[in-house]
Amino acid sequence: MFRIYTAHSLGQKWVENYQECSAIFACIVGFTETGLIPGISAAGATPEARKYTAIADAEFLINGVQSSYHYPLPPLSQGVSPVFITRAVVEACNIPIYLFNAGLPTPPSVPYIDLKGKSANCLTTGKALPLPLVYELFQQGLKWGKKLAKDHTKNYLILSECVVGGTTTALSILTGLGINATEKVNSSHPHCNHKQKELIVKEGFKNAGYSYNLKPINPFELVAAVGDPMQIVVAGMAISASLKTGVMLAGGTQMLAVYALIKSIINTSKYQGNLDNIIVGTTRWVAEDLTGDTVTLAESIGTVPLFATQLNFSSSSYQQLQMYEQGYVKEGVGAGGCAIAASLSYNWTQEKLLNRIENLVNNYHRIRN
């Protein structure tokens, strides 16, 4: 029920090493004011709604279906939040959840681990985050990755994200690491807004004093200039955890950017990780998005095994889920990674996964109405 799209032999080796293990799920939430640019993201119908997307997703991830919410899931122009996919799996499989706040404007209403970060300024400023904070968030990531791997020796880690506007900060990181990602990234829109993203990234590079010429930049300085707080936390977590266990970076474009960041940090600093233990896991809607080029992007980064769940909503009874097949939403909150884990570690079929997701959507609407 999942497919390996790139670096097949490395990916197959990862499967052999970890398919008998169960998963631990960590979600790292953060915010960038890039997400408030009109039209940049479909993860929330308005810029105001997008301020609360990550907080609402976090609440649903932890609590599931409730009669009321501190922060209800924001309306989307089409489709439904990918957190329904994630919650369906973690709830039924009893997967432990760790929620990390890397930098939100408003703290989550559910229990979380505070990494003492802050929201990023819009990347167009060229001053997204203070450099000392980037180093501190990286150290927090190293600490927690090591701890999670030590506390769960018989598990692999799924590291997920929720950052609205994060595919645009991902494009800036990929570009700054010397990777040609032009027209290869994805978005929550059915047709990726490549031109808008590119103009935003170019403005950020100009204001940061960087030339837009695919010449690699120091990874920490790059995140400080045009990144977001989630990226550097997940990079730190994956680097330290990979020395002990398997790591699945659960996401599409955003996690490919994090993988590229990890490679750059390992290659240019004293920090050591085991790249053979790290894969990227996403959805078919990302991997096969014709308005981006995820597979070529993964190959440009190097030997990164790109996995994608083959979950299909064509036969779903719910129109909100069917919208995924038309290119809306696609991924987020580790949806693809959890769907892969359901198949890899818990032997779920496509039918069982679809049934669990539909039951959750049904219960949500029944109780909310």
Curated annotation (Swiss-Prot):
It comes from Crocosphaera subtropica (strain ATCC 51142 / BH68). NCBIfam families: nicotinate mononucleotide-dependent phosphoribosyltransferase CobT, PRK04447.1-6. SUPFAM superfamilies: Nicotinate mononucleotide:5,6-dimethylbenzimidazole phosphoribosyltransferase (CobT). The lineage of its organism: Bacteria, Bacillati, Cyanobacteriota, Cyanophyceae, Oscillatoriophycideae. PANTHER family: PTHR38811, UPF0284 PROTEIN SLL1500 (PTHR38811:SF1). InterPro entries: Nict_dMeBzImd_PRibTrfase, Nict_dMeBzImd_PRibTrfase_arc, Nict_dMeBzImd_PRibTrfase_sf. CDD domains: DMB-PRT_CobT. One of its GO terms (molecular function) is nicotinate-nucleotide-dimethylbenzimidazole phosphoribosyltransferase activity. This is UPF0284 protein cce_1085. Belongs to the UPF0284 family.
